């Protein structure tokens, strides 16, 4: 399916997968309204401030996006984060609340606000994670949030069945973005260690998966795409090259 002339809304668009997807959508002729807290880093046709954890910010974002675009053909729910890698007993409610409000409440909120404006033939894409398919140690809040996103995508597809709106989740493993920097409080040494000794997936490669789903024929729904580095079989199992 051709994307030229379509309208897209993208969250979490200031870096990484979000920024790469915005770029590739625009290269395909899509007009993109994109948002992030660091709006100065967003490069889209319409760049808007957005905090998905804040109802007023989210409402203003969607209203402005729809006013500029006139309707939505593609929604990419990409905003999300993880904080820390500690056993659950060492986690705090503040950290858990931040992760769940961003990754779960924010996704539901943006979807609810956008859905009335999604046109026939539209497509809603969720940025999931292999953490939403199989747990690993010391990541309870993030894992719970991504299982929730996967469950919501299933439920939304059931609710939209019979309407010409497709729903896809892209579940990624290790992708070299600012994700690990955020997770470890901008500790570059800890973040770099996540990707040491292997070739991680790149943001462009995940964006390619998003566009692959979007460009299938309208009668085809790719429910899920799982993308991982060759060296990773699950969230907890990674084979690294010997640094020696």
Predicted segment positions?
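Residue(s) in the substrate-gating loop at a strand-loop-helix junction
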Residues: 129
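C-terminal helical subdomain
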Residues: 169-170, 188-236
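Alpha-helical segment proximal to the catalytic Tyr-Lys
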Residues: 116, 158-161
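Active-site helix of classical SDR
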Residues: 111, 145
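Substrate-binding pocket helix/loop in short-chain dehydrogenase/reductase
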Residues: 86-88, 95-98
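The beta1-alpha1 cofactor-binding region of Rossmann-like NAD(H)/NADP(H)-dependent oxidoreductases
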Residues: 50-60, 93
């Amino acid at each position: 399916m051709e994307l030229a002339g379509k309208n897209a809304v993208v969250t979490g668009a200031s870096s990484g997968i979000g920024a790469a997807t915005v770029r590739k959508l625009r290269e395909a002729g899509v007009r993109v309204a994109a948002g992030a807290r660091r709006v100065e880093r967003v490069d889209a046709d319409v760049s808007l401030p957005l905090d998905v954890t804040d109802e007023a910010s989210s409402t203003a974002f969607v209203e402005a996006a729809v006013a500029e675009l006139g309707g939505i053909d593609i929604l990419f729910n990409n905003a999300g984060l993880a904080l820390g890698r500690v056993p659950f007993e060492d986690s705090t409610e503040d950290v858990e609340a931040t992760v769940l409000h961003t990754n779960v409440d924010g996704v539901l909120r943006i979807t609810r606000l956008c859905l009335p404006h999604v046109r026939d033939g539209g497509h809603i894409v969720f940025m999931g994670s292999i953490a939403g398919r199989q747990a690993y140690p010391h990541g309870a809040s993030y894992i719970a949030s991504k299982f929730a996103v996967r469950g919501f995508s299933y439920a939304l597809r059931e609710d939209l069945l019979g309407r010409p709106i497709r729903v896809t989740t892209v579940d990624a493993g290790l992708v070299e973005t600012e994700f690990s920097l955020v997770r470890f409080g901008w500790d570059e040494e800890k973040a770099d260690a996540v990707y040491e000794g292997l070739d991680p997936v790149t943001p462009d490669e995940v964006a390619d998966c998003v566009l692959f789903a979007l460009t299938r024929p309208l009668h085809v729904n790719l429910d899920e795409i799982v993308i991982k580095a060759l060296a990773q079989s699950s969230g907890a199992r990674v084979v690294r090259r010997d640094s020696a």
